[in-house]
């Protein structure tokens, strides 16, 4: 598996983890957990963009 594909898989994992935390924070009225989820999703989006750039440069 290429580095770009590995990064893409990690990015998807971070986005899923972030969405889960965000939803859990909403369900339990936990603003800190919700913020963590949004941060994790943003990290996943950034990593996804980097992975796309790596894949397009090959």
UniProtKB/Swiss-Prot annotation:
Protein family per UniProt: Belongs to the UPF0337 (CsbD) family.
Region (Disordered): 1-58
This protein's name: UPF0337 protein OB2685
Gene3D superfamilies in the cross-refs: YjbJ (1.10.1470.10)
Organism of derivation: Oceanobacillus iheyensis (strain DSM 14371 / CIP 107618 / JCM 11309 / KCTC 3954 / HTE831)
Short name of any one Pfam family annotated for the protein: CsbD
InterPro entries per record: CsbD, YjbJ_sf
Xref: SUPFAM superfamilies: Hypothetical protein YjbJ (SSF69047)
Basic and acidic residues composition-biased segments: 1-22, 30-46
